[in-house]
């Protein structure tokens, strides 16, 4: 985003004023309001959590009885009822580490994005690949009837990923929150009712 555009960004300004770590908080707030992905007392796994705005929203939605564990390659500062750890979703041992630390999750939230190269085909394929890795972890820790949400770069592999997730959930829906920038290709795949 160009510096001039950032100054005009309504959600960025609100995030700063309301103490969120990034404007992405409003995407999850909107999704959770519409689909109730996270409820009071939920245990939540946040994959790709840095800088931590989704952890903030998840911790608030889960409340005092809830727990949030964020995982990212980068450090994300912990919060009340939210811990973070460094980890790579493509590391096959991460699922077991998360399961030992968290137990079963009621919701998995995933806002993963690769380091963008500027080559759309490469970036899209890489982002979808990260989602498949995250879905493997989700499959290990998500409780039956649990919910999930994944950021998806729209493109040639998005429908295939949605179909893959559709086999695991009672309902899936692709949506674009108003907090997403209009020019962004990101969509969010909401997945409800994990079949386990």
Swiss-Prot record:
<dbReference type="InterPro" id="IPR029063">
    <property type="entry name" value="SAM-dependent_MTases_sf"/>
</dbReference>
<dbReference type="InterPro" id="IPR002877">
    <property type="entry name" value="RNA_MeTrfase_FtsJ_dom"/>
</dbReference>
<comment type="similarity">
    <text>Belongs to the class I-like SAM-binding methyltransferase superfamily. RNA methyltransferase RlmE family.</text>
</comment>
<feature type="active site" description="Proton acceptor">
    <location>
        <position position="151"/>
    </location>
</feature>
<keyword id="KW-0698">rRNA processing</keyword>
<keyword id="KW-0489">Methyltransferase</keyword>
<feature type="binding site">
    <location>
        <position position="111"/>
    </location>
    <ligand>
        <name>S-adenosyl-L-methionine</name>
    </ligand>
</feature>
<protein>
    <recommendedName>
        <fullName>Ribosomal RNA large subunit methyltransferase E</fullName>
        <ecNumber>2.1.1.166</ecNumber>
    </recommendedName>
</protein>
<keyword id="KW-0949">S-adenosyl-L-methionine</keyword>
<dbReference type="GO" id="GO:0008650">
    <property type="term" value="F:rRNA (uridine-2'-O-)-methyltransferase activity"/>
</dbReference>
<keyword id="KW-0963">Cytoplasm</keyword>
<feature type="binding site">
    <location>
        <position position="88"/>
    </location>
    <ligand>
        <name>S-adenosyl-L-methionine</name>
    </ligand>
</feature>
<feature type="binding site">
    <location>
        <position position="72"/>
    </location>
    <ligand>
        <name>S-adenosyl-L-methionine</name>
    </ligand>
</feature>
<feature type="binding site">
    <location>
        <position position="54"/>
    </location>
    <ligand>
        <name>S-adenosyl-L-methionine</name>
    </ligand>
</feature>
<dbReference type="InterPro" id="IPR050082">
    <property type="entry name" value="RNA_methyltr_RlmE"/>
</dbReference>
<comment type="function">
    <text>Specifically methylates the uridine in position 2552 of 23S rRNA at the 2'-O position of the ribose in the fully assembled 50S ribosomal subunit.</text>
</comment>
<dbReference type="InterPro" id="IPR015507">
    <property type="entry name" value="rRNA-MeTfrase_E"/>
</dbReference>
<dbReference type="Pfam" id="PF01728">
    <property type="entry name" value="FtsJ"/>
</dbReference>
<dbReference type="GO" id="GO:0005737">
    <property type="term" value="C:cytoplasm"/>
</dbReference>
<feature type="binding site">
    <location>
        <position position="52"/>
    </location>
    <ligand>
        <name>S-adenosyl-L-methionine</name>
    </ligand>
</feature>
<keyword id="KW-0808">Transferase</keyword>
